[in-house]
Design a protein with these regions (language model features):
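A structural motif corresponding to the C-terminal end of an alpha-helix
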Residues: 22, 105-116
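Active-site-adjacent beta->alpha loops and helix N-cap segments on the catalytic face
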Residues: 7-11, 31-47, 124-135
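Active-site glycine-rich loop that binds ribose-phosphate moieties when present
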Residues: 7-22
Length: 142
């Protein structure tokens, strides 16, 4: 794992380098849901170079309640406050639509620094993930 949201990302990078020295060949990141996470992903790519594959985590946020829960209760996940605010007052359909857009934008921002993505399905919403995969295939990947 590579926690892009670690309070002291330099320590996280040192741990990643140690993991590489001990045979690690790739990393899965925490979900990319902030500019800080993208910046740390860039720093990880620069520091670790081509020595390891990095798969950026993409987890669609589907409601304000979901975003607040992840921000406050899930260790290692940081949801940018602007994202949390955008979900205010949205119904389920609008929340899913916004979550889809946020996820596509996060993937676009992370793409230059990642070797690929791994997707986390929120609340068994398979149809949402099908839509996300289709968008990523046409808008983000080659």
């Amino acid at each position: 794992a590579l926690n892009l949201n670690a309070r002291n990302f330099e320590v996280e990078l040192r741990r990643a380098a140690e993991k590489l020295e001990n045979g690690m060949s790739g990393f899965l990141t925490q979900p990319v849901l902030s500019a800080q996470a993208v910046g740390n992903l860039k720093k990880a790519r620069e520091t670790l170079g081509g020595r390891a594959k990095i798969l950026a985590g993409i987890l669609p946020v589907v409601s304000q309640r979901n975003a607040i829960f992840m921000e406050n209760e899930v260790n290692g996940i940081h949801v940018d406050e602007t994202i949390i605010q955008k979900f205010e007052g949205l119904d389920r359909a609008a929340g899913e639509e916004l979550g889809l857009e946020v996820s596509v934008q996060a993937a676009k921002a992370a793409a230059p620094y990642a070797d690929g993505f791994y997707l986390m399905t929120p609340f068994n919403r398979v149809a949402l993930m099908e839509r996300l995969i289709a968008r990523l295939r046409t808008e983000v990947t080659d």
